[in-house]
Amino acid sequence: MRPSGRTASQIRPVTITRQYTCHAEGSVLVEFGNTKVLCNATVEEGVPRFMKGQGKGWVTAEYSMLPRATHTRSGREAARGKQGGRTLEIQRLIARSLRAALDLKLLGENTITLDCDVIQADGGTRTASITGACVALVDALTYMRSKGIIKTNPLKHMIAALSVGIYEGTPIADLEYTEDSEAETDMNIVMTETGKLIEVQGTAEGEPFSFEELDELLKIGKHGLRELFDIQKAALA
């Protein structure tokens, strides 16, 4: 039995609120149960030096957690003068995932930065960030078209992400913190709405897992991701 009483494949209630702040070209508050992440998309002219002259755009991301997003206060990384390895890993994952959603040639030499700030953490912050940031990205692209910055929508497909894992011997979807901290296996799946995989990150925290368990994790992950795509589309309707 899961602590929340959810079934093995049941995801938490998910809410996506668009235009959450007034300044960003795309702004979304995404909630997976008690996990809440603010995803803001900023459009800027120009690209990083290594991209100049290629006629393509760029998508990058930054990720952070507010000091009291967790049970105990964590100090601001800015105060320490450097980002931690976990933060760097997560923001690279977010950026890689979102770049896979676009035809960068159609973006022109423009950069979109996704800032994902965790307001409250209860597991699955990186997957919530990707799912919410994709909606913020769509709104930023709409803004760019309305201002004549781009002529054609570069979006190839929506993307979303979901955590899965093995908890007390059972494959489950969308782990909350109490499950994540005790899971025997922890995995994140990033997928396109067409059913293709962008990234699968999986680690046996305790007992190694079998190929049969891997297949089951991918199966319940795909089922949950289908629900997330429906929620994204409803938010954008």
Swiss-Prot record:
Molecular function per GO: 3'-5'-RNA exonuclease activity; tRNA binding; tRNA nucleotidyltransferase activity
Keyword rRNA processing listed: yes
Catalytic activity of the protein: tRNA(n+1) + phosphate = tRNA(n) + a ribonucleoside 5'-diphosphate
InterPro entries, per database record: ExoRNase_PH_dom1, ExoRNase_PH_dom2, ExoRNase_PH_dom2_sf, PNPase/RNase_PH_dom_sf, Ribosomal_Su5_D2-typ_SF, RNase_PH, RNase_PH_bac-type, RNase_PH_CS
Binding residue positions for phosphate: 86, 124-126
E.C. number(s) listed in UniProt: 2.7.7.56
PROSITE patterns hit by this protein: RIBONUCLEASE_PH
One Pfam family of this chain: RNase_PH
Top-tier EC class: transferase
Keywords linked to the UniProt accession: Nucleotidyltransferase, RNA-binding, rRNA processing, Transferase, tRNA processing, tRNA-binding
Superkingdom of the organism of origin: Bacteria
Family: Belongs to the RNase PH family.
SUBUNIT field: Homohexameric ring arranged as a trimer of dimers.
Role summary: Phosphorolytic 3'-5' exoribonuclease that plays an important role in tRNA 3'-end maturation. Removes nucleotide residues following the 3'-CCA terminus of tRNAs; can also add nucleotides to the ends of RNA molecules by using nucleoside diphosphates as substrates, but this may not be physiologically important. Probably plays a role in initiation of 16S rRNA degradation (leading to ribosome degradation) during starvation.
Protein's UniProt name: Ribonuclease PH
